[in-house]
From Swiss-Prot:
Domain of life: Bacteria
Protein name as catalogued: Cytochrome c'
Function: Cytochrome c' is the most widely occurring bacterial c-type cytochrome. Cytochromes c' are high-spin proteins and the heme has no sixth ligand. Their exact function is not known.
Single annotated GO MF: iron ion binding
Protein keywords: Electron transport, Heme, Iron, Metal-binding, Transport
Pfam families in UniProt: Cytochrom_C_2 (PF01322)
Species of the source: Magnetospirillum fulvum
Entry-linked InterPro entries: Cyt_c/b562, Cyt_c_II, Cyt_c_prime, Cyt_c_prime_subgr
GO cellular component: periplasmic space
Length: 128
């Protein structure tokens, strides 16, 4: 049985909250606003899992729902680009996990690259 768009939207919102909760401490560290999270590598590995699961929540029809926070016209026209963005997020998060194990300087450098992937997708597809 296929999931209803409303169920997928809830899944998506939960996954995005999870991604944010894992990313925020790393981003704070990279920006010099927080200490290095002791569990930075695990957080980055969690981000990989979320990035691989997240596309499930963006099934066709979910972009037009109230509270979707998605630019429906951009999503509809560029859904392949959107899915490629998730692949890029998984790849950058994998690099982030390796960088976290390599040390603080490597983590900061890779966090900048990971953040660019987040920002590019948000600018293209997320409603203000």
């Amino acid at each position: 049985q296929q999931s209803k768009p409303e169920e997928l939207l809830k899944l998506r919102q939960g996954l995005m909250q999870t991604l944010k909760s894992q990313w925020a401490p790393i981003a704070g560290f990279a920006a010099g606003k927080a200490d290095l999270p002791a569990d930075a590598a695990q957080r980055a590995e969690n981000m990989v899992l979320v990035a691989k699961l997240a596309p499930i929540g963006w099934a066709k029809g979910t972009e037009a729902l109230p509270n979707s926070e998605t630019k429906a016209e951009a999503f509809g026209a560029k859904s392949a680009q959107f899915m490629e963005g998730w692949k890029a997020m998984a790849a950058e998060s994998t690099k982030l996990a390796a960088a976290a194990k390599a040390g603080p300087d490597a983590l900061k450098a890779q966090a900048a690259a990971t953040g660019k992937v987040c920002k590019a997708c948000h600018e293209e597809f997320k409603q203000d």
